[in-house]
Amino acid sequence: MPLILPEFIESDEKMKYNIPGDCMIGLKNPYISVEYSGQPSFGGDQRRCGGKVLQRCGCGVVAALDMLLYLNCWHSDVHIPEFANFCAASPLPQPAYEQALEMLRRAYFPLFYPFGMNGLALSLGMNLFFKRHTLPYKARWSVPRTELWQRIGAMLERDLPVIMAVGPNFPRFWQKKGANFFRLSPEGRYEPSVSARAHFVTATGLDDEWIELSSWGSRYYMRRDEFARYAKECSNSLLCSILYIEHK
């Protein structure tokens, strides 16, 4: 079940939805930011990497690194020597961030160009990292479809970012149907922005209607029913799922 290339399409259509409510569950601390040219990012962006492999299919490695950096910065039971000099209070320098990406790609999350990696490979790499660094966590790929939102909420309540996959089209893998992402405008409108498929993202917030996401170094939102629709009509619930992480 390879995750292949993201498909993102700018949309001119404008729609209005309610802004996120006070009931949104979110991470308790600032999310990882990288100092690219321009404004600081919301998570890493594989498209800005220097290497062709990471640029084209590195979304899973970016999601894994952002999660590990977040744990190292904000969880007292996590100490990762390789990330000791990274500071969560300010944007991370792009060269240091890309060096960490390359380390993870070579040692834990191999990418098969141009297909990337799938959820099972992501879970195996994460568990290997946890074991080598004696971290008190374990990871597994996919949860039952009926428990998806409950598990995402539970992880966010424990201040754990949630790596999600918008899976590839399946079984018609050659199709280019995507799930719609939105941005929140200064006026409080959710406006359609991009469409994605075969792409790892990170959930940083959740309410009854919306998921807050980090993808391509930016903050996006996706409707919960849109994710469910895409999984049912264009992919399946194994490919469209999460990396569930528990404390041992």
Question: What does each model-identified segment do?
Answer:
Residues 3-121, 194:
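Active-site-adjacent structural segments surrounding the nucleophilic cysteine of cysteine proteases
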